[in-house]
A protein has these predicted regions:
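N-terminal helix-turn-helix DNA-binding core of bacterial DNA-binding proteins
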Residues: 2-44
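Short amphipathic alpha-helical segments enriched in hydrophobics
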Residues: 38, 53-56
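Short, hydrophobic-biased segments on the C-terminal half of alpha helices
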Residues: 46-51
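Beta-hairpin "wing" of winged helix-turn-helix
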Residues: 55-69, 74
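Short, structured secondary-structure boundary patches
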Residues: 65-67, 81-84
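Accessory beta->alpha helical hairpin/"wing" motif in late/C-terminal subdomains of nucleic-acid enzymes
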Residues: 75-80
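Amphipathic alpha-helical dimerization/coiled-coil segments
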Residues: 84-97
């Protein structure tokens, strides 16, 4: 990968991936979807999910799946506002190059 995958870029990609699912999505699927855009390990991604939860950009809930709990992540209003900010910043950046 040519670009540095700093915290803001990872946050933007994760928020974009999670925002596609209205009812939220689970960690493994988020990892698979993010990997379509950039090469990232689960050990890198889960701290991003925790940080976004702490920053109130994601809400977390558990749901039963095949007899066990699966943790789901859903974008909050604050998360959507942050994603929109990242999108605007990206448009401004790309116009300059």
């Amino acid at each position: 990968m040519v670009f540095n995958t700093g915290a803001a870029l990872l946050d933007a990609i994760v928020l974009a991936v999670v925002s596609r699912e209205k009812e939220g999505t689970y960690g493994y699927k988020i990892t698979q979807d993010v990997r379509k855009a950039i090469d990232v390990s689960e050990s890198t991604l889960y701290p991003v999910l925790r940080r976004l939860q702490k920053d109130e950009c994601l809400e977390v809930y558990d749901r039963q799946f095949d007899g066990r709990n699966r943790r789901y992540y859903k974008v909050t209003e604050r998360g959507m506002a942050q994603l929109n900010l990242y999108h605007e910043e990206w448009k401004n950046y790309s116009r300059k190059i």
